[in-house]
């Protein structure tokens, strides 16, 4: 965790912390905690806002020192923008802005009072949960491979949250831990995060908690199961594949929810070598796997009363003389044959065997998560994941969960009219569908291996990581998936 969290019900003026975080709207209206500090300081805060020394525009933060009558030596005022437009997005932005500002200063402890602000269609528990998740995300720093480079460990370490809902705090912390676990795996370089490392890390976590267990299948075990599609992708790499299976037994005899995550630890494209820019970001091609593992972490930490199974096919798509080729015909675990049209459409080839394997758990619902297609990014950008399902109830559950926590998805069609694009003369199915509708035809391919399941597909290519040299894994959609499971544990939305 980037931060430690506690609950605090002290009066703002008497709180023993290094800094108190309050808010101010564009019309200069102060948040309730800010009003309390203003009263304690005999109008000092109002005067600073009135003369422009404290900004109130969205995205601004102003640090005020030594307010009279206030125990804390600093007050951070966060601009909240237009009060009439204040809602989920401005609230989450304000929390993130505050955490980033606190992390850069000489402030070890702080009290966040923004949780007192009413957010339309949300309750106090939501405010607390999301404050924890967003502030920890904003405070995260990657340090695993910095070596001798100086790591700045100054700044905020403990954030007290105004409120009294201990369960909301616990669920928020659990979700934040899951997000950070996923981000850390996603950010590791591919010479560190190999299939074996990913499997060992996941198994090590599961081994620490009663009710959690892990099973790691090696190449020989997968071959015995007939996973010819997955193993074909693995043929060109010196880093041998693993199938990671994690189980959380919190729901008695109930059928489990099953998450399957694409775990391509590095994607060269194979024989269809990636020639355009962006190959250096292909370490993020395992973020589907990292994020379902992160969701498992959140579920275990929150002790949700459900059964959960996570399956991650962990494979490196590399090139050598034994690598699979375009025009190869391979046999999947389901028995269906696949003609390889492009070796860079490998994610669906490992997922189809993992989805077939997942059937043995008799899922209540089956959801796969994958950085599957650039086409999804072209269609939807970086703001939302793509969602495909033939099951309206499941799709609506996932969409609602994403909206609730602002980790959103957008539904794309999965109509039968697209299926013909996957026809093959030489096999049961072709692994690519041509130039148009690539995200949808990828979903159609997976649907052929989930025909008897209540299944949905999340294409997270656009949301799993930030672009560019300084980009990092985001941990999305751990928030969406954890909220979906929390909703199921509570008996519905």
From Swiss-Prot:
Enzyme class: hydrolase
CDD domains recorded: Peptidase_M17 (cd00433)
Active-site residues from the entry: 274, 348
Superkingdom of the organism of origin: Bacteria
Co-factor binding comment: Binds 2 manganese ions per subunit.
SUPFAM superfamilies the record matches: Macro domain-like, Zn-dependent exopeptidases
Example GO biological process: proteolysis
EC number(s) recorded for this UniProt protein: 3.4.11.1, 3.4.11.10
Cofactor: Mn(2+)
Residues that coordinate or bind Mn(2+) 1: 267, 344, 346
Binding-site list for Mn(2+) 2: 262, 267, 285, 346
This protein's UniProt keywords: Aminopeptidase, Cytoplasm, Hydrolase, Manganese, Metal-binding, Protease
Gene Ontology CC annotations of this record: cytoplasm
InterPro entries (UniProt xref): Leucine_aapep/pepB, Macro_dom-like, Peptidase_M17_C, Peptidase_M17_leu_NH2_pept, Peptidase_M17_N
NCBIfam families, per the entry: PRK00913.1-4
Function: Presumably involved in the processing and regular turnover of intracellular proteins. Catalyzes the removal of unsubstituted N-terminal amino acids from various peptides.
Protein's name in the database: Probable cytosol aminopeptidase
